[in-house]
From Swiss-Prot:
PANTHER family: EXOSOME COMPLEX COMPONENT (PTHR11953), EXOSOME COMPLEX COMPONENT RRP41 (PTHR11953:SF0). This is Ribonuclease PH. Its EC number is 2.7.7.56. It catalyses: tRNA(n+1) + phosphate = tRNA(n) + a ribonucleoside 5'-diphosphate. The gene is rph. It comes from Burkholderia cenocepacia (strain HI2424). The lineage of its organism: Bacteria, Pseudomonadati, Pseudomonadota, Betaproteobacteria, Burkholderiales.
Length: 246
């Protein structure tokens, strides 16, 4: 069923877009990555602060939190900056919480110590899958921030317990497909975002039927596609981290 679908990009049903992770993209942050999924481009930075939120004071553990935003012309038409409106949208809040949860799932916060890693994901160009690209790139940025702490003698070992990556899947023209771009996302019957660890554990599954309910068989097929795609993304993370892999 998945092999016969005709996708706007010409990709196979189980084929990722071209994915690139460019490390050390900016010079000031402890970790920075430009992540590209086809025409979707997100700048992910990881910054370290030697303090924790008030609710973690005297607990002897660290924290990791995330913020997400889109540049005004990241999409086809310009959007006002949320700062100019004075309020974040519900979508923005949902996505940045998802990014934070995803990364905390693979961090030993006690081993991080009483400090905070701030993840910032800024969408430069959007063509579908910005939240999943953000998670995949943010992990590499966080890894580099941890490496900076180890090199400075502030950490004896890495608090990272596993890799984490994310991908979108959906039912497009009746067939399950991997890594939806905007042309597919805007027309799909089902849209699902899946976050998994390198060991194959599920961190989060967000699935919505866009008018046409999906079956259990379709859900299983989508999860299988996502698992295969995330395995590819984790391998790419390992490849780009190379010798510095924790």
């Amino acid at each position: 069923m998945t092999s016969s679908v005709s996708r706007p990009s010409g990709r196979r049903a189980d084929e990722l877009r071209k994915v690139a992770l460019t490390r050390h993209y900016t010079k000031h942050a402890e970790g920075s990555v430009l992540v590209e999924f086809g025409d979707t481009k997100v700048l992910c930075t990881a910054s370290v602060a030697e303090r924790v939120p008030e609710f973690l004071r005297e607990r002897g553990q660290g924290w990791l939190t995330a913020e997400y935003g889109m540049l005004p012309r990241a999409t086809h038409t310009r959007s006002d900056r949320e700062a100019a409106r004075g309020k974040q949208t519900g979508r923005t809040q949902e996505i940045q919480r998802l990014i934070g949860r995803a990364l905390r799932a693979v961090f030993d916060l006690e081993a991080l110590g009483p400090r905070t890693i701030h993840i910032d994901c800024d969408v430069i160009q959007a063509d579908g899958g910005t939240r999943t690209a953000s998670i995949t790139g943010a992990f590499v940025a966080a890894h580099d921030a941890v490496s900076t702490l180890i090199a400075a003698g502030k950490l004896a070992r890495s608090p990272i317990t596993d890799h984490v990556a994310a991908i979108s899947v959906g039912v497009y023209e009746g067939a399950p497909v991997l890594d939806l771009d905007y042309a597919e996302d805007s027309r799909c019957d089902t849209d699902m975002n899946v976050v998994m660890t390198g060991a194959g554990g599920f961190v989060e599954v967000q699935g919505t039927a866009e008018g046409v309910p999906f079956s259990r068989a379709e859900m299983n097929a989508l999860l299988d596609l996502a698992q295969g795609g995330i395995a590819e993304l984790v391998q790419l993370q390992k490849d780009v981290l190379g010798a510095s892999h924790a």
